[in-house]
């Protein structure tokens, strides 16, 4: 389930972003972006020069200087607008979460049990460890763990999913989130956080970006941009004495225009917007990342640990075959298996009934009309079945049925052992059926591998990402399913300790590991993984250990998370390539215009045949500003993502954004120059 997507240029967001762009013109805000701070200083300097020229205090073309100054200010505003628009989209998404915080009062229990005396207190006064009672119609006032009761809970305000979920004490479904609503029954909840520390509070603060910290890659790129800016600043500063020595000193306005066009203003103006938009796209997929670092790490992941059930397989095993023991016909086995499953409401039990009906036209029979007694499955017996008159039919795991047969004085056939082993090798789970002490045969329960999953794993493999299936199945079954699904490796009979050891092993090899989890036993592995996506339906411990929370609680989402992370890194790299390639065309526009009077040989570089020095310089400055606006949609939506190898992706991006970065400015600057000339603006 995805949240409602905002239009790229929502009118209300655009208006608000324009206001914020003007507010960001203050020096304190500009200082955070060194590249744009240089442009801001240049704008201020050229404005002062324009005023001085207009008043007669300085010689020069005041109109040209004012035009350059105006477009430099527009460049700064466009960069501010890109960042403000990205932040505005994130804040708009956060407002949907803010609307959840409506509860005003809570019933705080004096004792941790249902029926204890309750005091009505403001919800924002609840502390960690307090016990509260919530009943049908109430909004849960805090994050916590259910310690008593069970209820249907509407979590649509947070997840966007309209179907209610069950929350109950014990197990992995005891965690509740403040702001969700109880639909039926009641819950006694122990608060797990203090005011201001709830899941909603943390998520709102993160989404709004108030505390957004730069990621390592973002910092590294910023350092590169600063270095390039310093190099171009020094180069530009040395040009003035050269031109002055030649007898025709270049004006400060032209030098500022040259500097601004040469430094990487395009990526400098869009860098913050790309980071904010990456987290916003993650929320659009109903995944909340606790930091931009987590989103970035998702783009660098090269090992995926995937749970078999629900991620690789559909999660519900289906009966696929009846394999009779020696001397037993298949219909007899199917009849007994169906009888043993008549009152079994599990998906596996229903599939056995359906398979018997399909194969042998065996109709369901009413357990009550048969005067039969149903024997439910228990963790101790690991069997279920039915007693009809003198018939005692059971189905269950191999070990459980073996003990049952031997306890009733029977013998477990060797040929059935072989059939069990054969079923396991094929990736299915064997269930053995017995009547009295006579083993009738084996039911093969097959895990259904999700359609298209093998192709997705093949795409991940092309990208250099290794997939590892995690399962509690035995090695034979795990190996068969792994082969069918097309994963690169598997961990069978997985325990929390084994998962943690596997993650550490891959990290010791220098790999970045991503995984999903929902239980308390997953918390150590989630805390160790580089990208850890906790299920919203999971325990509080799992959500605290992870650095992302999937509001849909869909383990398959991990693959989408990696795609979004890679798209953000690709967007940043592609726009950096485009920005630096841009400088070449601007060099051919401004250098001849600025210095041809001193060094006529430079006219050979005027390959665009621009109308005049003034029009050439102004055209380059205008293009430099407009390209930021044209690239805002790309920064917010991300570049087109295709699962390719690293080398193929590099070649593709160099062709599109490297060559494009060279050609687009030549065309753009020439078109602007023609328009300025036709309109007699220079």
UniProtKB/Swiss-Prot annotation:
One of its GO terms (cellular component) is plasma membrane. SUPFAM superfamilies: Calcium ATPase, transduction domain A, Calcium ATPase, transmembrane domain M, HAD-like, Metal cation-transporting ATPase, ATP-binding domain N. The active site is at residue 307. It comes from Escherichia coli (strain ATCC 8739 / DSM 1576 / NBRC 3972 / NCIMB 8545 / WDCM 00012 / Crooks). This is Potassium-transporting ATPase ATP-binding subunit. Its main location: membrane. GO terms for molecular function: ATP binding; ATP hydrolysis activity; magnesium ion binding; P-type potassium transmembrane transporter activity. The keyword Glycoprotein does not apply. It is found in: Cell inner membrane. It is a multi-pass membrane protein. Gene3D superfamilies: Calcium-transporting ATPase, cytoplasmic domain N, Calcium-transporting ATPase, cytoplasmic transduction domain A, HAD superfamily/HAD-like. Belongs to the cation transport ATPase (P-type) (TC 3.A.3) family. Type IA subfamily.
